[in-house]
Amino acid sequence: MERERNLNNLRYSSSKFLQQAIRVNHAGEYGAICIYSGQKFILKKSSIIKEIIEMEEQEKKHFHYFNEKIKEQKVRPTVLLPVWRVLGVSLGVATAIMGRKTAMACTAAVEEVIGEHYKEQVLHLEDGELRETISKFRDEELEHRDIAIEHNAEGAFGYNILSSFIKTGCKAAIYLSKLI
């Protein structure tokens, strides 16, 4: 009886983790698209617009993947998507208004947190298609971070403070999207 209860608890725990992972990844990719959308609006004539568009296109592919997983696994999306839209576009616009370096500092901070978040998920997921895909997406997110650093993200005024602020916001969004 005890063993059966433990097995049921493990199944519930695994199922709950899977649902939270899909929900939060769906929300995160949506938020990233919104950030890039805000940056594109301001930096449309900038020398880094090509990179921003390419990174946004990858985020759209990630989002579509998790959107399919939401449907396939019957996972409830976070109710916070409208909030993430407003905050994401606003963050993209605000950092882009402060200049290319600040926009790239935003990208570097966000992608670093997402890379760590995906790494943690990969460690907890069983082998399979979802784990492989999240691992691939993690590599792509870290490429975005590296592109941002190559474009002098760390040269942004107040980089350390800005980066810490954005990383904290991302971690809060991850936490809330898992639950709500």
Regions found by a protein language model. Give the residues of each.
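Non-heme di-metal
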Residues: 1-180
